Amino acid sequence: GKEGLSAYRCSLTFDPRTANGHLSLSLENRRAEHLISGPRPVPPYEVRFDHTWQVLCFQSFRSGRHYWELEVSKPWAYVGVTYETIPRKEKGKRCMVGMNDLSWSLQLDEHQLCAWHSGRREALAGPSHHSRIGMLLDYEAGTLTYYGDGQTRLHAFHCAFTEELFPACWIGEGVSITLCST
């Protein structure tokens, strides 16, 4: 149950250096919003996603169990984890979380809840959007488990993780994602 998960709760913040120019960070880097007004000029960083509406967290995990929650304002987002080596400068879908073999994601949209890894999609049953998503990473067990509002288990990935994992969010137009501090 939820009580069990809170033992592993961690605090996350978005890394502004990684944030695509369409994304604006606020609330001490705990909220990322996709501005419909267009991209802002941002200083070039090697770690920035140049063409992909994506941002990573500062925090990363190489071991242990970690639980975090995020609030997604409306459908059109992919939330997951990635290795640091995810491509960041290309155009097209290859840089998106879940669209390469370096990352895993859950797609929230208006039609169908989906899980993605290596660009392969698994359609999931149930509502296609949840405004609050919980994620439990158990590094040694090789599992990433998603929970929807009210702690419904939505999906679990099973994989032998080999590198540090960074929480990652791809954010569609007009959507904001907030990392819950409690």
Label each PLM-derived region with a short phrase.
Residues 1-182:
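Beta-rich ligand-recognition domains in immune and ubiquitin systems
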